[in-house]
Amino acid sequence: MHLLKVGTWRNNTAFSWLIMFGVLWLVSQNCCRASVVWTAYMNISFHVGNHVLSELGETGVFGRSSTLKRVAGVIVPPEGKIQNACNPNTIFSRSKYSETWLALIERGGCTFTQKIKVAAEKGASGVIIYNFPGTGNQVFPMFHQAFEDVVVVMIGNLKGTEIFHLIKKGVLITAMVEVGRKHIIWMNHYLVSFVIVTTATLAYFIFYHIHRLCLARIQNRRWQRLTTDLQNAFGQLQLRVVKEGDEEINPNGDSCVICFEHYKPNDIVRILTCKHFFHKNCIDPWILSHGTCPICKCDILKVLGIQVDVENGTEPLQVLMSSELCETLSPSEEETNNEVSPAGTSDKVIHVEENPTSQNNDSQPHSVVEDVHPSP
């Protein structure tokens, strides 16, 4: 059946989708390289008069290309209102109490590499970059160019802003940065998003095609049942071969109201349940597409016990007729099983009557089949 071909096409489509997403998955594996991230233990000391307050915690994360070593010094922010250190002429007021110092720089305005380069050229042993406002204490490993013997660490915005304001108030703050724990990250957030979207899309297409396949199988079974019913139903409709001497081939005889051609000898006509008759090749597609008699509008399929869903359309029925019925109901078989004998030997004869006074069928003849009992 044609529907089986459609189902096969849908299966091929699903298989092609599976291949495509499989290739995408293999390509994505090349992006899934393990990366190492090192956290930073920071011992921050606040010198207030003769008192020193220390704070120790794993509050930072090293940059991707940072030197991994221990470093200590005074924390020094840039002078002025702009704290991003994007200007090569940025000035850092170095403390006279320590030879080593760590630059405290705000994120934004330029790349991390530019900030680190400015601080390294000014003599900083390390660079502490704090995150954007509104990010809390969120940190991430920065991508930047490698600088020899320069430690690069990111801390959260809250901690960085707190240190900056205390320094502006005259508090001397020192920090000792040590290498913390190592974390291995197998996938970045871009790859995670890609995997999630790919998996969701793949799952959708799998379930979609499974659903369509189930519907196609159900529809195939329904068409098979309908084929059998139509074969049995059309077998109930009588067929007749028009022969020489029949009234239908007289000069004043009737013509088929579907093709408007006169009946000729050896024409095969089908007699409907309403007793109207037409060319078999004309009326069969008509019944499948309209379901009614062209003259009296009698619902032929309903009379024969066939229920067809309107929403399925008429084209599938015509396809079904051409692909199934024509293979099983050949004219020779139909003539053998359903042919009505000629008028002289049968008790049923076709008569054609003109009904010129009919208002509903002004141009269409009225054909009936009457029972005729031969005289003894």
Curated annotation (Swiss-Prot):
It is an enzyme of class 2 (transferase). It comes from the Eukaryota. It is a single-pass membrane protein. InterPro entries: PA_dom_sf, PA_domain, Znf_RING, Znf_RING/FYVE/PHD. One of its GO terms (biological process) is protein ubiquitination. It catalyses: S-ubiquitinyl-[E2 ubiquitin-conjugating enzyme]-L-cysteine + [acceptor protein]-L-lysine = [E2 ubiquitin-conjugating enzyme]-L-cysteine + N(6)-ubiquitinyl-[acceptor protein]-L-lysine. One of its GO terms (cellular component) is endoplasmic reticulum membrane. Interacts with E3 ligase UBE2J1. Keywords: Endoplasmic reticulum, Membrane, Metal-binding, Transferase, Transmembrane, Transmembrane helix, Ubl conjugation, Ubl conjugation pathway, Zinc, Zinc-finger. The chain crosses the membrane at residues 190-210. PANTHER family: E3 UBIQUITIN-PROTEIN LIGASE ATL42 (PTHR46539), RING FINGER PROTEIN 128 (PTHR46539:SF27). This is E3 ubiquitin-protein ligase RNF133. Auto-ubiquitinated. It comes from Macaca fascicularis. GO terms for molecular function: transferase activity; zinc ion binding. Residues 65-167 form the PA domain. Has E3 ubiquitin-protein ligase activity. Plays a role in male fecundity through the interaction with the E2 ubituitin-protein ligase UBE2J1. PROSITE patterns: ZF_RING_2. Pathway: Protein modification; protein ubiquitination. Residues 355-366 have a biased composition (Polar residues). It is found in: Endoplasmic reticulum membrane. Its EC number is 2.3.2.27. Residues 328-376 are annotated as: Disordered. The keyword Transmembrane applies. A zinc finger (RING-type) spans 256-297.
